[in-house]
Design a protein with these regions (language model features):
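Surface-exposed loop/turn and secondary-structure junction residues enriched for glycine/proline
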Residues: 53, 189-190
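Iron-sulfur-cluster electron-transfer modules
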Residues: 1
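Long, contiguous internal "core" modules enriched in hydrophobic/ aromatic residues
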Residues: 4-8, 12-181
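Short, highly charged, low-complexity non-transmembrane loops/tails of multi-pass membrane proteins
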Residues: 190-196
Length: 196
């Protein structure tokens, strides 16, 4: 069933790409809602796949879906911010707000995830992430590069109302690099403890 979600989202993305190439704003408007639903469905399916690993307690948290949805928003805003360097993307303020909102939501959900108390295996995995072998990757890559830097750059871009896309593109690149660092640490942490 998840394959259908992925195929539908890929089809919507392909149609969006064609609409962009042909400068068909009407089709892009029609595809906006299916694109958002497809992105949310893809993030949801990813959470479902993690939940199938029942021996990995860290991946069973009820916050996993909200974290992945917030990360999907972050990745979408980051992608548009970077594309604005080579394409003329309208509404760059909206893109900055989407990126900032995604980063803020991701930070809030990650904090809730770390502050919550689960099983002993969850506690060990969180300890590995925040104070163990993955701590530098998590704090420097995931939090500083992936959350603090993009938020600061997006706020600066909104405050200065600059016409140059470089500032927001830098925020987007930092956000995606941080998402990678966080997710890598999250997956490693889940695997660092014995199966429950």
């Amino acid at each position: 069933k998840g394959a259908y979600v992925l195929m539908a989202f890929a089809a919507v993305c392909a149609a969006w790409f064609v609409a962009g190439l042909t400068d068909n704003a009407g089709l892009i408007e029609i595809l906006a809602i299916p694109a958002v639903l497809g992105a949310a469905g893809t993030a949801g399916y990813t959470a479902y796949l993690f939940a199938q690993c029942e021996g990995r307690d860290l991946w069973q948290t009820p916050l996993l879906l909200p974290v992945l949805l917030a990360q999907a928003v972050t990745a979408g805003g980051a992608s548009y911010a970077v594309m604005d360097v080579i394409l003329d993307i309208p509404e760059t303020d909206a893109i900055a707000w989407v990126l900032l909102g995604g980063v803020a939501a991701t930070a809030a959900f990650v904090w809730m995830e770390l502050a919550s108390h689960g099983s002993r295996h969850v506690e060990l995995a969180v300890e590995t992430t925040t104070h163990g072998r993955d701590a530098r990757q998590f704090w420097v890559g995931g939090v500083l590069v992936g959350m603090v830097v993009p938020a600061a750059l997006a706020i600066l871009a909104l405050a200065t109302d600059t016409a140059s896309p470089a500032l927001l593109a830098s925020a987007g690149i930092a956000a995606v690099a941080g998402l990678f660092a966080y997710e890598d640490a999250f997956v490693r942490a889940g695997q660092s403890v014995p199966l429950s």
